[in-house]
Structures are given as C-alpha cells and as structure tokens.
Amino acid sequence: MTPEVVKMLVIGLAAGLGFFGPALAFGLIGFSAMQSLGRNPEARGAILTNMILIGALAEAIGIYVLIVCIIMAMVVK
C-alpha cells in the first residue's frame, strides 16, 4: 500500500470513530426522552425542548469531526 492509501484509511477510521460519539449521544438522548415521557407525560414541552437543544450540541460535534476529516483529506497529497 502506498502512503497516500494509508493516510486515507486513517482519515476514514478517524471519521468512523469520531462519528461514533454523536451517534451514541443521539441514541441516549432519544432513550432518555422517551423514558421521561413515559414517567411524566405532562412535561412534554420541556422534555422536547431540552432534547432538541442537546441534540443540536451533539450534532455540532459530528460537524466538527467532518470538518477536521475534510481538512485532513485536503492535506494528503
């Protein structure tokens, strides 16, 4: 394998591992929200608001990972 191929494989591995955190966070957010709604259905508005806010923060981490991987791919020549 050439060094360029190895670098691209490393970038792909970094992206895969980097997106694992936000994916896990989204799963836990959804699980916790559904569990909270099951216990207290009247608090739907507050739970939904917090779920969307935390989901946006988790998505930001995924976007940062994507940007870093794109920059790393541009540097490889």
Question: What does each model-identified segment do?
Answer:
Residues 1-77:
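Hydrophobic, small-residue-rich transmembrane alpha-helices and their short perimembrane loops
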